[in-house]
Amino acid sequence: MSTNFNELPVVVIGAGPVGLATAAHLRERGLTPLVLEAGATIGAAIEQWGHTRLFSPWQYDIDSAARRLLEPTGWTEPDPDALPTGHELIKHYLAPLAKLLGDDVIRTGARVVAVSREGIDKTRSAGREQTPFLVRVQAADGAVTDVRARSVIDASGTWGQPNPLGRSGLPAPGENAAID
């Protein structure tokens, strides 16, 4: 494991369209991405509504950096005017992009449970900007590990994390008691 701050990976939380596009942009810039996906597969949230057709055609669904990475591989870009389903988005875009990025970049079944700065707490903050992040990850089998990162990008999305009904991002009185 590298001890040089600039050689540490940039952790991306979530392997959906935004997370994988972020990894493509990082790779283009010569940075090392590490994508951590809580689900068992890339695009796990999309799988839950995969039968649904998107409102936006392919021309708006494919990120430019991802396209630049995919084009030299012989990947066939879908019809830019067609409206894909969630399953088609995964099959024709996310899966090829994930395969290109590789298993060393994407870890599925890896839920981020906490993010902190290494050696920093409420009383120690000197040198914070050059201190690695510490990302605590829980694997599907329950094992917990810490990953050092130069930065962290949250692309986990909102699926399964609904906005509370109350004001200011807080649950309405009684809302938590009514949750199934």
Model-derived features with residue positions:
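Feature captures the FAD/FMN-dependent oxidoreductase FAD-binding
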Residues: 76-161
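Glycine-rich active-site loop/strand segments that organize a redox cofactor
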Residues: 41-92
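A short, basic/flexible loop-to-alpha-helix module at the beginning of a structural domain
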Residues: 1-8, 180
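Conserved Rossmann-like nucleotide-cofactor binding loop
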Residues: 18, 41, 159
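Short glycine-/acidic-enriched loop or helix-start segments at secondary-structure transitions
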Residues: 22, 45, 117, 163-165
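Glycine-rich dinucleotide-binding loop and its adjacent helix/turn
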Residues: 156-180
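Glycine-rich FAD pyrophosphate-binding loop
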Residues: 27-49
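N-terminal Rossmann-like FAD-binding beta1-loop-alpha1 element of flavoenzymes
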Residues: 8-35
